[in-house]
Amino acid sequence: MDTKAFKRSLNHSENYYRQGFGHKDEVAGMMTSEYQSSLIQEIRDNNYELTRGDVTIYLAEAFGFCWGVERAVAMAYETRKHFPTEKIWVTNEIIHNPSVNNRLKEMNVHFIEVVDGDKDFSGVANGDVVILPAFGATVQEMQLLNDRGCTIVDTTCPWVSKVWNSVEKHKKKNYTSIIHGKYKHEETVATSSFAGTYLVLLNLEEAEYVRNYILHGGDRQTFLDKFKNAYSEGFDPDKDLDRVGVANQTTMLKSETEQMGKLFEQTMLEKFGPTEINDHFMSFNTICDATQERQDAMFDLVEKDLDLMVVIGGFNSSNTTHLQEIAVERNIPSYHIDSGDRLLGNNVIAHKPLDGEITTQTHWLPAGKLKIGVTSGASTPDKVVEDVIAKIFAEKAQPAALV
């Protein structure tokens, strides 16, 4: 399928919207009321620090809603305003934040259900309005909705679209796209639908395995079994790794994506030599500014003498998980929560460890004075961060917190 031609055609459709509907000012007021926070602004104005009682909060200098997320949510709100009576769907969570998604449900926006691992579009009818979320949708989903005569509201983040353009360039020039990401993540699923031949790699360990295969060969079936579900149909590691271009899921760790790019560039240099490198490796620049800024701010934050760290964001949020990784790698006790509701009172917290299930921790706030770092993922509103910080202050002021 010529995905570029399809997108070009869709862009000219009278049923396709990407710029909003003229309700920007009204929606901005709603967004401010529902998602912004006077407490968080106070902390910003106080050099990102606030002390109350025995607790000093250190807030990361870049955190929370990124521009792409704010844009997507605002467009969803505008869509409801512009189509007050039409049935509105969103193909996935609009962003990875439960409070925002629940708010859309309150506005009578329907979410496409997943049945046996596949999205069920059977309830979507001609004339329905369908919102594509911030991390995009597959080209096949777009085609289905277009063929069904739906009104499509595309809130895909421009940084994600930039990655799609990169993999389409790879496809046009017969390069295999090496995509640094999680093959099940909605953004990577969408990105791979625009690619030709592709292989999704989670981390540098997997990249090193592929590098070794490129340079020294190996058992083809073992390779295919190792990366099952993470490559394009018909992918052959013996033929499809001679020409590669690197792209990424925008929420992955910047440093790891850069290392992966350098690793494959060096691999092709070793295999084909400096005179042939440009025919076998395509450079990239698809790292999202907002992701980078939040990670850089987190690296700065963990340099402080923190007693513990609280990372706030959806449990399925990739960018939030990577912020948590930074704290864990510095051996800072760190708690990933998705809302203030996870602070259960009596000095008990329900949190999600890296690569683990939600667990309950008692006496998580030690006695005495505490320095607590706080950050949040790109899909987390300031109001949610405020709720968490306020509950920490209240919890620490209670006798139970000192047990």
From Swiss-Prot:
Q: How would you classify this enzyme at the top EC level? A: oxidoreductase
Where [4Fe-4S] cluster binds, per the record, is at 66, 157, 288
Cysteines joined through disulfide linkages? none
Q: Which residues bind isopentenyl diphosphate?
A: 96, 185, 317-319, 379
Iron-sulfur in keyword set:
yes
Pathway(s) the chain acts in: Isoprenoid biosynthesis; dimethylallyl diphosphate biosynthesis; dimethylallyl diphosphate from (2E)-4-hydroxy-3-methylbutenyl diphosphate: step 1/1; Isoprenoid biosynthesis; isopentenyl diphosphate biosynthesis via DXP pathway; isopentenyl diphosphate from 1-deoxy-D-xylulose 5-phosphate: step 6/6
Q: Which residues bind dimethylallyl diphosphate?
A: 96, 185, 317-319, 379
User: So which cofactors does this thing need?
Assistant: [4Fe-4S] cluster
Q: Which GO terms describe its molecular function?
A: 4 iron, 4 sulfur cluster binding; 4-hydroxy-3-methylbut-2-enyl diphosphate reductase activity; metal ion binding
Q: Which residues bind (2E)-4-hydroxy-3-methylbut-2-enyl diphosphate?
A: 96, 185, 250, 317-319, 379
Q: What is its EC number?
A: 1.17.7.4
Function comment: Catalyzes the conversion of 1-hydroxy-2-methyl-2-(E)-butenyl 4-diphosphate (HMBPP) into a mixture of isopentenyl diphosphate (IPP) and dimethylallyl diphosphate (DMAPP). Acts in the terminal step of the DOXP/MEP pathway for isoprenoid precursor biosynthesis.
The entry's family comment says:
Belongs to the IspH family.
Checking PANTHER family in the record gives: 4-HYDROXY-3-METHYLBUT-2-ENYL DIPHOSPHATE REDUCTASE, CHLOROPLASTIC
Q: What protein am I looking at?
A: 4-hydroxy-3-methylbut-2-enyl diphosphate reductase
